[in-house]
Amino acid sequence: MQNIRNIAIIAHVDHGKTTLVDKMLLAGNLFRNNQNSGELILDNNDLERERGITILSKNVSINYNGTKINIIDTPGHSDFGGEVERVLNMADGCILLVDAFEGPMPQTRFVLQKALEIGLKPIVVVNKVDKPNCRPEEVYEMVFDLMFSLNATEDQLDFPVIYGSAKNNWMSTDWQKPTDTITPLLDCIVENIPAPQQLEGTPQMFITSLDYSSYTGRIAVGRVHRGTLKEGMNVTLVKRNGDMFKTKIKELHVFEGLGRVKTTEVSSGDICALVGIDGFEIGDTVCDFENPEALPPIAIDEPTMSMLFTINDSPFFGKDGKFVTSRHIHDRLMKELDKNLALRVKKSEEDGKWIVSGRGVLHLSVLIETMRREGYELQVGQPQVIFKEIDGVKCEPIEELTINVPEEYSSKIIDMVTRRKGEMVKMENTGERINLEFDMPSRGIIGLRTNVLTASAGEAIMAHRFKEYQPFKGEIERRTNGSMIAMESGTAFAYAIDKLQDRGKFFIFPQDEVYAGQVVGEHSHDNDLVINVTKSKKLTNMRASGSDEKARLIPPVQFSLEEALEYIKEDEYVEVTPKAMRMRKVILDEIERKRANKS
């Protein structure tokens, strides 16, 4: 029986989690000496590399002095809370990675709390101690206080600490004495993290994630809880609702390095992948053929936000995308449900529309962005918060919001948040910056980020996570400015935009193709304004001497997908295609729009 350690890595965005795993892989001699592995081995989809966030959890394993260490990378952002909980169930211990300057951040707290509740043993790694003005000792104190406030047990509070710099490939027990390898960390893992318990008896395995291969179909991944699984064995699949299906394991794989290796049997405590089990879902149990016993299912966070997805019916329909029909979008959303636990999809009464609910704007925008890159065209409506009726009272989701700003901007920010029904819970000074904590309705957070950044000259750091449902807090003011809407379809000209600049801000560049009903800018007043941006200068006028002024254009405002989703009003859609992102009115025709407003 080989030695196994299952370990999850918890860290805030950008504290160097993925880099640390890269170095651990190198230390386990996964790559030949002449083979260049590239950076960020684990964040293997483009979106994750661009945003620097880990969305899906990955499994890799290294062999260190005869001990097999399974490393499980967890997503740090609470919008992917559904991911976090099932992943932690595969581990026996965790590494909490914190930045030696910033200390533990609110998002880390979310994952750490889940880990401590399950009873994982933590190891704290203070990373980036090579940065100037870092404060490792204070950070250590902060971590201790955080764990204490999360009700950690005495055993958990007695955690080992390792200092180092993952980027420069060293770890040490004392931050003033750099070493030249990261083996102190690996030794620490082997000594402090308990080996998984060997449970004898009938086999049980909990399915915590899945892989997909176009060749063999869906592959179940999970940790063997008890007993031994063998290739070709007959097993029972127990669903979350208690239904049972008899099935058979065709192939067994274990993780080795970055890939999977076929094997004949896997015993309890190791993490493996099963091929040939049909119709499983995440959270099901694979157990004995004769006397099946299911493991208790994990609770997954309920969705708090929903959006309308619909087929692209704009005049530019089908220009960029490969998949544009409702059948394509329907199949893609169904496929996403397999992997994405916290997602719900409901078909609307109207044809070609779906209500998609998730954990927050980030969760849903990552899905839209992924679909866009795969060549889908679709339109999305304004994000709506999901209300619940609890004991006859209408309730809405409340989030815990943390904003860290320089002192001089704090009053502006507090004013902005309280206007959106946020209640201040705590305020503390840390040097020249202030840490503000609020309880705030999710409705108020939609569209808040852009305003906070503008008010604080881009200095604010903002993070939020779902807390609970509370009674409805009343109306919240939304964007008050109207939109500027294109009058007819065609090419936008600098000449026309120049003449209209005093009406508001534009979102389009000259020479962009626009269509009637597209939102091309923000009006400076609260009503919508229909403008003609396709008007060009008449040629006969060209020769009048001295009257030819150059058009001086203010650069247009450009939106990211999240910003656009938070910006639009109820009667607007964001149109998303592989090459472009536009905002438009739901009803394109101006006269029809007026009619609808009157009724």
Q: Residue locations for each model-derived region?
A:
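P-loop NTPase switch module centered on the Walker A-proximal segment
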Residues: 1-98, 102-104, 142, 210-213
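Residue-level signature of catalytic and energy-coupling elements of molecular machines
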Residues: 14, 20, 52, 71-73, ...
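Interdomain boundary/hinge elements
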Residues: 36-42, 150-162, 196-206, 242-255, ...
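Canonical P-loop GTPase G-domain recognition
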Residues: 121, 131-191
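A short, contiguous, amphipathic alpha-helix enriched in charged residues
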Residues: 314-337, 550, 554
